[in-house]
From Swiss-Prot:
The protein's assembly and partners: Part of the 50S ribosomal subunit; part of the 5S rRNA/L5/L18/L25 subcomplex. Contacts the 5S and 23S rRNAs.
Protein name: Large ribosomal subunit protein uL18
Gene behind this protein: rplR
GO CC aspect terms: cytosolic large ribosomal subunit
GO process terms (BP): translation
Organism listed in the record: Burkholderia mallei (strain ATCC 23344)
Function: This is one of the proteins that bind and probably mediate the attachment of the 5S RNA into the large ribosomal subunit, where it forms part of the central protuberance.
Classification via HAMAP family: Ribosomal_uL18_B
MF terms in GO: 5S rRNA binding; structural constituent of ribosome
Family: Belongs to the universal ribosomal protein uL18 family.
Pfam family membership, one: Ribosomal_L18p
Keyword annotations of the record: Ribonucleoprotein, Ribosomal protein, RNA-binding, rRNA-binding
Length: 121
């Protein structure tokens, strides 16, 4: 089993457990150059809020710093944005789905920023 298959296996198990809880899910996906966050409905079929480093506003803010979306500063910004959007959609608490990625670096920065912005998980 290679690295990608192991990550996907971990993600699948996490999503099964979160589905049993029937709560909104904050899913994170990261690539080498970008990071994405989405809040899914408790049934898992609708996206209620989303944020990523591909958004024009985010890219403009990141252009001042490093111009890239693949760093901790970008992940922190996305964490704040997803928390604001989720709260605007009426969601106060979520289950954190790290999609099989280690809770370290950019994933950790996004989670901590979302918590600081008022999202509970």
């Amino acid at each position: 089993m290679d690295k990608t298959q192991s990550r996907l296996r971990r993600a699948r198990q996490t999503r099964i457990k979160i589905a049993e809880l029937q709560v909104a899910r904050l899913a994170v996906h990261r690539t080498n150059t970008h990071i994405y966050a989405q809040v899914f409905s408790p049934c898992g079929t609708k996206v209620l809020a989303s944020a990523s480093t591909l958004e024009a506003e985010v890219r403009a803010q990141l252009a001042d710093k490093s111009g890239k979306g693949g760093n901790v500063a970008a992940a922190t910004l996305i964490g704040k944005r997803i928390a604001e959007k989720a709260k605007a959609a009426g969601i106060e608490s979520v289950a954190f789905d790290r999609s099989g990625f280690r809770y370290h670096g950019r994933v950790k920065a996004l989670a901590e920023a979302a918590r600081e912005a008022g999202l509970k998980f």
